[in-house]
Design a protein with these regions (language model features):
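N-terminal type II signal-anchor transmembrane helix
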Residues: 2-141
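Non-catalytic, structured segments within soluble enzyme domains
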Residues: 18-25, 32-48, 52, 56-67, ...
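Extracytoplasmic
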Residues: 89, 125-131, 136-138, 147-149, ...
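Acidic helix-start/capping segments at beta-turn-to-alpha-helix junctions
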Residues: 104-122, 178-202, 282, 363-385, ...
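Active-site SXXK
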Residues: 160-171, 352, 429, 489-513, ...
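Acidic/histidine-enriched alpha-helical segments
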Residues: 181-190, 277-287, 354-373, 445-459, ...
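A penicillin-recognizing enzyme superfamily signal
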Residues: 419-448, 458, 468-483, 497, ...
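Short, glycine/proline-biased beta-turn/loop segments that scaffold the active-site neighborhood
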Residues: 489-585, 724-741, 834-852
């Protein structure tokens, strides 16, 4: 019986039952797992918990000073466009320009580790960013937003648009049944794509569908190089980043998924088009590719009651762009691609209707629409250049500060800039300049007011440097008059000349003060070196005199205002005074400056030139029975040092130039006659035909006259240089490089030995020169003007050379408003040059893991002028307002109690003309070049600036305005300047007294704000 039971229990039936039971359990288990997997694929419960926990560790914190733990992204389109990937280079460039990091983000260790592993930084990203420039108070001066037009939320997107997008790219993304759904993966689509991929490996011809969700596509478009996925690993990193970004706010992803749709529509890349550049986002694409109004189009698509024909056009435009993102450059720019895009659009219209996304009525209407893609973006209303000169100057400075190459790139940076400009004052000045061009303004006695160009710059001296408060002109073009012009302002050059004169007196004082009078009287002095002779005599007669006292005495030296003497310097000139009643007077330097009388300053410049001529290397003046006797010491040091230095300088000017550039360089700054001598000296073999071609469009008769009168044969290199208006060695270098365009610097120096010796021999041979030909420039005079130029450059003179003429004292060498302003800033700062600032603070990438704030470091001033000279010149400028040519400015600005604020100013008027004389000595041509009027000023101890008016070209003949015009504008700006003075947001100045030492500790704010 037991055996029977045993046999029964071991029967095949029992074994089969066990197998069935086990299989059933396994099937149920697998079914359960499948159900769980399906539920997880849809609801993402486990994924939500995991990724939320991981995302919670990805934290950032903004801390003071540079960060010791920060990560920057790769070179994806989004990161490069907004400047995130270029931030390290921009921060380095800014630090080299005097900025320091005051705050920067610190990322958590998990955040850093994730980025180091190749995942893009996880944070709530911006769809729109761009450059924003604020004034000193936070008001917006300039804003650039990229993309220009974006959807703010899903509610602002027409349902037809986002439903179409989801049908094309990610149909289950907004399924409301699964609030925790992982937006980074669509499991059914992934399974379908995986199956198709496996079949393709087995030889199937079926195409493999894409499995990317909108979230992973966003990661690719924003953070992968060139917006492309290059490997399976990169795709997995994109999915990981999309998942972490999806769960940043918690396990519920409903709002995140809605935002993904909006972000995608705002970020879809749509190639680039002329007149706009890179196109990103559906709304911008609609405007630039179809010329549509996005707001109107979106309202049309959101309304079911709108005419079907109009909705069909709008819908087809949207659909084409949603399809074009797959290959935008091909589908939007190439003719074959546009044909393909039309085919794809028609195909998808039919599919969308079959699936019920659009009505058959809309489908049929859209199929009949023929769209035309533009080849250039439509024009947009532009802001007048004249209204944004201050902001444009800031943008130009930002290029230098950040090292960014173009304004196109800079305007897309996620950057907010706080500037020193005052928007209210900018607008008030701009409005005033606009009113001045209205004929009803009646500020001109004659001439068309609409053709007058005005420019105003106002700066403030503060503890943190010299701040630009106003920078405005009325030129409706990118050209910036204050920074880019080169104008002859007339008598404002007397300001630079006066400073140079006082510097010479100071140099002589510092070298000779304290020496015995007998020694001072015994010093050999050239008979016409009047400044040296006077200074030594004054020191001998006044032992122990202070520097400020001798400077005041120098201001009292008398100079004749007579126009009758022969006064030449570098060229022949006839000088005259503006007021002929001055012709018979002798004026002190002070009065000549205050009243702006020309002839005394011509003589002052003559004395300055003579002072430097006596001190040129290799030359000495000796008194040998004639007061102007000159001998030249032609020793080897002159040949080796001075000559080499000049050759090197001229080589740098012409280096690497072939024949064309050399001749074009010769054109600059020369009259037609001088250019003829230069051309024939450099190209002696050139015939009349080549000469005529170079001098077109002159008449044939004039060309022949110039050619015949400029024959260099038989003339020395010195004579040819003088006739060409250039240093003989420069003329020689130009000729040598014309023949040997690839010569090295040392080759030129070696080849120049003979000509350098020739010049020295000429100096020695002419120790007792006969009356010189006035056409021939003096070599020592030219070299003296080089020394004067160095002195002017140290104080901010902007150009590469001075015209070697005494007329430089009255404006013939030109100037620039910004640089005149800088000179007055040096005077107001007691001789110390401080940096001029427009940008105070940079705020990169606010609200991102790259956020960085920078402020300009405290400025370091450079003493370029003694405080004693600065004080003397300021006093003279004040006298110009109280009793001189700037009298109209008196009382232009008043303090709170109604009393006039101290103002100092120097005026200038330029009536600049081209005059040509015939062989009979009579003027054969006289035409206007331009007319200018300017005033450079300071107000109290804080504010200073320049106001300029000018008319260029032949039209200048129809105007007769003088410096009274900018002075009148200064008075009209009185209320604006008074408001600036009472603004309490500025930093305190460096000195309690307007003319005090700037090195002392800063005074109280109230003291600094009470101009004396």
């Amino acid at each position: 019986m037991p055996n029977a039971v045993a046999n029964a229990s071991g029967s095949p039936w029992v074994g089969r039952r066990w197998i069935v039971t086990t299989a059933s359990v396994l099937v149920m288990l697998f079914a359960l797992l499948a159900l769980v997997a399906r539920d997880e694929a849809r609801a993402s419960w486990l994924q939500a918990r995991y990724f939320t926990r991981q995302a919670s560790q990805l934290t950032t914190e903004l801390g003071a000073g540079p960060s010791d733990r920060i990560r920057f992204p790769g070179d994806g389109p989004h990161d490069r466009r907004f400047g995130y990937s270029r931030l390290p280079a921009a921060l380095q460039a800014a630090s080299e320009q005097g900025f320091r990091i005051t705050a920067q983000v610190r990322v958590s260790e998990p955040f850093a580790a994730l980025v180091d592993r190749g995942v893009s930084p996880i944070f709530r990203e911006k769809t729109q960013a761009g450059l924003r420039i604020l004034d000193r108070h936070g008001a917006t001066l300039f804003v650039s937003r990229y993309p220009e037009r974006v959807y703010s939320s899903l509610d602002s997107v027409p349902p037809l648009v986002w439903q179409t997008l989801l049908f094309l790219e990610n149909r289950a993304l907004l399924d409301p049944r699964f609030p925790n759904h992982n937006p980074s993966v669509d499991w059914p689509r992934m399974a379908q794509a995986g199956t198709a991929l496996a079949l393709s490996w087995l030889g199937s011809a079926r195409s493999v569908p894409g499995a990317s969700t909108l979230a992973t596509q966003l990661e690719k478009l924003r953070h992968s190089t060139e917006g492309r996925t290059r490997s399976a690993r990169e795709k997995l990193l994109q999915m990981e980043a999309a998942a972490l970004r999806g769960y940043l706010s918690g396990e519920n992803t409903e709002s995140v998924r809605r935002q993904i749709v909006v972000d995608y529509l705002n970020s879809v890349p749509l190639a680039a088009i002329a007149g706009h550049g890179e196109v990103t986002g559906l709304n911008d694409g609609l405007r630039v590719w179809y010329g549509a109004d996005p707001d109107q189009l979106n309202r049309l698509l959101a309304s079911d009651s709108a005419p079907v024909a109009r909705r069909a056009i709008a819908y087809r435009q949207v659909l084409t762009l949603l399809l074009a993102h797959r290959r935008p450059s091909y589908l939007l720019l190439q003719e074959d691609g546009r044909t393909e895009l039309r085919r794809l659009t028609d195909q998808h219209l039919r599919r969308l209707a079959r699936e019920g996304i659009i009505s058959t009525e809309l489908r049929d209407a859209a199929l009949t629409v023929d769209l035309t893609l533009r080849s250039r973006a439509p024009d947009v209303p532009r802001v007048a250049f004249s209204e944004r000169k201050g902001a444009d100057a800031v943008r130009a400075e930002l290029l230098r500060v950040t090292g960014v190459a173009t304004l196109y790139d800079l305007d897309r940076f996620d950057l907010t800039v706080r500037t020193t400009l005052d928007l209210r004052a900018q607008e008030e000045v701009a409005n005033l300049l606009a009113r001045l061009t209205d004929p009803a303004s009646r500020v001109l006695d004659r001439g068309d007011p609409t053709r007058v160009i005005y420019a105003v710059v106002v700066r403030e001296r503060t503890q943190n440097g010299n701040m630009v408060r106003v920078q405005v002109d009325n030129v409706d073009s990118p050209f910036n008059v204050n920074e880019g012009s080169k104008l002859q302002f007339g008598s404002t050059a007397k300001l630079r000349t006066l400073i140079t004169y006082l510097e010479i007196v100071e140099q002589l004082y510092l070298r000779n003060a304290g020496r015995p009078a007998v020694n001072l009287r015994a010093d050999p002095v050239g008979a016409d070196d009047w400044i040296t002779a006077w200074t030594l005599a004054y020191l001998a007669a006044n032992p122990g005199v202070s520097l400020d006292r001798i400077l005041e005495a120098a201001m009292s030296r008398p100079y004749s205002a007579s126009p009758n003497d022969s006064l030449t310097g570098g060229d022949s000139h006839m000088f005259r005074n503006v007021d002929t009643t001055d012709d018979d007077q002798t004026l002190s330097v002070r009065d000549a400056f205050v009243r702006s009388v020309n002839l005394p300053f011509i003589r002052i410049m003559r004395d300055i030139v003579r002072y430097y001529m006596y001190r040129l290397p290799g030359s000495v003046y000796l008194l040998r029975g004639h007061p102007a006797e000159l001998t030249w010491d032609h020793d080897h040091r002159m040949a080796d040092d001075e000559g080499r230095e000049l050759i090197e300088q001229f080589y740098q000017k012409y280096t690497d130039a072939n024949a064309g550039p050399v001749l074009e360089t010769l054109r600059r700054g020369r009259s037609v006659t001088q250019l003829a001598w230069a051309y024939r000296s450099v190209t002696p073999e050139a015939g009349l035909a080549e000469f005529g071609h170079f001098f077109q469009p002159l008449s044939d008769a004039r060309i022949a006259e110039l050619y015949d009168s400029s024959d260099p044969i038989g003339l020395s290199i010195s004579d040819r240089g003088g006739l060409a208006g250039m240093h003989p060695l420069e003329l020689w270098v130009a000729a040598y490089l014309y023949r040997h365009p690839r010569a090295l610097q040392q080759d030129v120096i070696d080849a120049s030995a003979a000509v350098r010796q020739e010049l020295l021999d000429q100096r020695s041979a002419h120790a007792r020169p006969a009356t010189p030909d006035r056409r021939i420039g003096s070599i020592p005079e030219m070299e003296a003007f080089r020394e004067i130029h160095r002195a002017w450059q140290r104080l901010g003179y902007p150009f590469e050379s001075l015209k070697p003429s005494y007329a430089t004292a009255i404006g013939s060498s030109a100037d620039r408003p910004d640089d005149l302003t800088e000179l007055v800033g040096i005077l107001l700062n007691d001789g110390i040059r401080y940096p001029v600032q427009r940008v105070e603070e940079l705020h990169f990438a606010a609200g991102t893991p790259y956020e960085t704030l920078l402020r300009r470091s405290p400025p370091h001033g450079e003493r370029v002028l003694s405080s004693e000279i600065a004080a003397v010149v300021r006093t003279a400028m004040v006298a110009g307002v109280t009793r001189g040519t700037a009298r109209r400015a008196f009382g232009a600005v008043r303090a709170a109690d109604g009393s006039p604020v101290l103002i100092g100013a120097k005026t200038g008027t330029g009536d600049n003309r081209f005059r040509m004389k015939g062989r009979d000595g009579l003027v054969s041509e006289d035409r206007a070049i331009d007319r200018t009027a300017t005033v450079v000023f300071f107000i109290g101890d804080r504010f200073y600036g320049t106001i300029t008016a000018f008319v260029s070209g032949a039209a200048a003949d129809r105007y007769d305005f003088t410096s009274a015009l900018p002075l009148q504008i200064l008075k009209m700006l009185g209320p604006t300047l008074e408001a600036l003075m009472t603004d309490l947001t500025s930093e305190p100045c460096r000195s309690a007294h307007p003319y005090g030492q700037m090195d002392r500790a800063p005074p109280s704010r109230d003291t600094c704000r009470s101009p004396q």
